[in-house]
């Protein structure tokens, strides 16, 4: 079977000219727009996206049978069944160039390892934000770049897989993500 496809940035911008392409795809799709890209996809302003992020993301994911990660402060994930969850990890220091590229690569990496799109997406979004939170705690709230986030991943993955994540992170409400809507 074919692997799911992850589409970001200019791929999303290209789709905005012909959304019917999404209906012809027979493999699972994961789209990772930021609010501006999402606005182009649905033909509204970024401000309108921000006012009704959850409903717009859920409707789009359901209408086009895709998984959608609407990036931003409190990134959210919507699935083809019309469910959504909000990720609470991450911080404002992550609003810099290349962070979305890292996230897209993480999602694709988890899919390539055999995770289904929902788990791959939830895990990647969570770890992406967690790495940003660890960097903010160690270095301060701003001034890190995408490369710093990538450098943090091996240590975080090892800690998570071995159950050695610090207790303060394991018990923090921000690090539990379930379908909420």
Please place each PLM-identified region on the residue numbering:
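Gly/Ser/Thr-rich beta-alpha loop segments that engage phosphate groups in nucleotides
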Residues: 13, 74, 92, 99-103, ...
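Glycine-rich phosphate/dinucleotide-binding loop and adjoining beta-alpha-beta core of small-molecule
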Residues: 1-89, 160-181
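Short, charged, surface-exposed loops that flank catalytic or proteolytic processing sites
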Residues: 44-52, 114-122, 140-144
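Short beta-alpha connecting loops at secondary-structure transitions
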Residues: 41-42, 88-94, 104, 108, ...
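Short, small-residue alpha-helix embedded
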Residues: 40, 96-127
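Short glycine- and Lys/Arg-enriched binding-loop motifs that mark or flank ligand-binding interfaces
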Residues: 7, 68, 86-89, 93-97, ...
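Charged C-terminal helix
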Residues: 130-181
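Feature representing long, continuous alpha-helical segments
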Residues: 55-58, 85, 104-105, 118, ...
């Amino acid at each position: 079977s074919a692997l799911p496809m992850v589409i970001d940035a200019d791929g999303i911008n290209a789709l905005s000219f012909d959304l019917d392409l999404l209906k012809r795809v027979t493999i699972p799709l994961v789209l990772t727009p930021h609010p501006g890209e999402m606005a182009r996809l649905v033909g509204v302003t970024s401000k309108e996206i921000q006012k009704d992020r959850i409903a717009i993301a859920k409707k789009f994911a359901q209408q086009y049978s895709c998984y959608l990660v609407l990036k931003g402060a409190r990134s959210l994930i919507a699935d083809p069944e019309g469910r959504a969850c909000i990720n609470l990890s991450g911080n404002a220091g992550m609003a810099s160039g290349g962070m979305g590229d890292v996230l897209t690569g993480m999602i694709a990496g988890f899919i390539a390892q055999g995770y289904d799109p929902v788990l791959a997406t939830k895990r990647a979004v969570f770890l992406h934000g967690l790495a940003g939170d660890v960097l903010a705690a160690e270095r301060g709230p701003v001034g890190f770049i995408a490369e710093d986030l990538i450098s943090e991943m091996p240590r975080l993955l090892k800690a998570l897989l071995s159950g050695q994540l610090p207790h303060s992170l394991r018990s923090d409400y921000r690090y539990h993500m379930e379908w909420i809507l």
